[in-house]
UniProtKB/Swiss-Prot annotation:
InterPro entries: Cation/H_exchanger_TM, K/H_exchanger, Na+/solute_symporter_sf. It comes from the Bacteria. One of its GO terms (biological process) is proton transmembrane transport. The keyword Transmembrane applies. Its main location: membrane. The chain crosses the membrane at residues 27-47, 89-109, 112-132, 145-165, 183-203, 204-224, 226-246, 261-281, 288-308, 350-370. It is a multi-pass membrane protein. This is Probable Na(+)/H(+) antiporter GerT. Keywords: Antiport, Ion transport, Membrane, Sodium, Sodium transport, Transmembrane, Transmembrane helix, Transport. The gene is gerT. Belongs to the monovalent cation:proton antiporter 2 (CPA2) transporter (TC 2.A.37) family. GO terms for molecular function: antiporter activity; monoatomic cation transmembrane transporter activity. The keyword Transport applies.
Amino acid sequence: MLFYFELVVILLCTKLAGDISVRLGQPSVLGKLIVGIIIGPAVLGIINSSELIDELSEIGVLLLMFMAGLETDLEELNRNLKSSFAVAAGGIIFPFIGGYVTGLLFGLIQSHAIFLGLLLCATSVSITVQTLRDLGKMNTRESTTILGAAVFDDVIVVILLAFVMSFLGTQDVNITLVIVKKIIFFVSIVFIAWKVVPWIMKMLVPLRVTEALISAALIICFSFSYYSEMMGIAGIIGAFAAGIAISQTEYKHEVEHKIEPIAYAIFVPVFFVSIGMEITFQGIGSQLWFIIIMTLIAIFTKLIGSGLGARLTGFNLQSSISIGAGMVSRGEVALIIAANGLTANLLAKENFTAIVIVVILTTIITPPLLKKYFV
């Protein structure tokens, strides 16, 4: 029964907060993120994390990235692969150096400083996607480059994580297996998207049941996400790939039209609130300067690194800054890496709490940055 009450509070508060945010000239997602902090454990404590909320949140982010895939122009994505790789590379090199040096300056041991640098390399564009949708900028060269860069970033960071945990952590990681799995994933996903997805859609859509088309689309979305997770890649990459696959079929516009109400009615609002709920202010007094400095390093190294990658591949200064801003959010990807670091003794418990706050702050700052720089 408590869950029903929590759901009422989440849906009501996110809609009101989103409206207030828009009235104040900001993307609606900013208000939804802030309301998660307010109604979560950090302030009012009305909503607490639970397995049900976590699961709804996971579905929310998958549907968000699925819709991003549906809206992505595949030809534009292919044209901007070079730029996407440069943006991802800059967004990994600069944050790694910044995080590593900052860790050493705060007295962290070598292995912990290296892991801290790796943690700042992560990028999660789910908040960026929502903000760009709010701004009506999803079908631009800049947004396509950001999405492509996020895929490169995820793969490179996962491989680097395997290296770091193998050499510095307590876990035994087979690096060759990690790399081979990534190659198998991308080769197989291209084949499945090209050959299997159209066949599945044609088989399931004619079924004489209610909303067979949407059920077929969701089956593909969640299957891709499951396969992605199974191969050691974030589920959001699989959902994004599923969206691109369906966007190449005749069903693209109908799926897009019908999925959006399902996603935004319940799942996506829960996802935004769940991010804000991760913040806790307990015991942060001793970590305050660490949090402030790390947040600034996290923001500016992505902004400069990814922005430089865009600038070097032909974007003008304004577009380069907007692309850098789109890569700032660390989101759920960094939280997963941080949890792995805690388990492998590569991240101290007090630093883990601080990093969670840093990750949330980078996520909250992303919508206003995009609003300011995305023309």
